[in-house]
């Protein structure tokens, strides 16, 4: 199956978009089953992952503005200083969402939109 992702709300076109798909709730935000690095040319970016098997997945993205491959954080609590987002666009206040809050079921071709925070 295909998972078509549109990421919105870019503030600039510096750097790149880094996308991670996982199917492991215990490794959410750590290990990517599939990943892509995409250049940013507009305030929206669209990309696709092909040949996904039926399953439950979560998608995390971040705008790597300085293109160093690391999600920059700041402050005492280490909140991301680069824009980020997750499938299902869960509320993010006191840390990243759980796998369950970001999980999507892929059993056919699917389109999702992720809004950067």
What are these regions (language model features)?
Residues 57-61:
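A short tyrosine-centered beta-strand micro-motif
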Residues 3-10, 19:
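A short, amphipathic beta-strand motif
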Residues 38-43, 106:
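Short proline/glycine- and polar residue-rich coil/turn motifs
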Residues 65-72:
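Acidic, glycine-anchored loop motifs typical of Ca2+
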Residues 82-117:
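Extracellular beta-sheet/turn segments enriched in Thr/Pro/Gly and aliphatic residues
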Residues 14, 54-56, 109:
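Extracellular Ig-like/FN3 beta-sandwich strand-entry sites
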Residues 12-26:
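Short, ordered, surface-exposed loop/turn motifs in non-cytosolic proteins
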Residues 43, 48, 53-56:
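A glycine-anchored, Pro-Gly-centered beta-turn/N-cap motif
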């Amino acid at each position: 199956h295909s998972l078509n992702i549109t990421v919105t709300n870019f503030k600039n076109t510096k750097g790149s978009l880094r996308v991670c798909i996982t199917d492991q709730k215990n490794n959410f935000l750590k290990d990517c089953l599939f990943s892509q690095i995409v250049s940013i040319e507009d305030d929206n970016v669209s990309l696709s992952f092909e040949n996904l098997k039926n399953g439950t997945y979560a998608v995390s993205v971040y705008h790597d503005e300085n293109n160093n491959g690391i999600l920059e954080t700041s402050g005492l609590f280490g909140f991301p200083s680069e824009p980020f987002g997750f499938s299902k666009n869960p509320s993010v206040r006191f840390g990243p969402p759980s796998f369950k809050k970001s999980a999507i079921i892929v059993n056919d071709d699917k389109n999702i939109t992720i809004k950067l925070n």
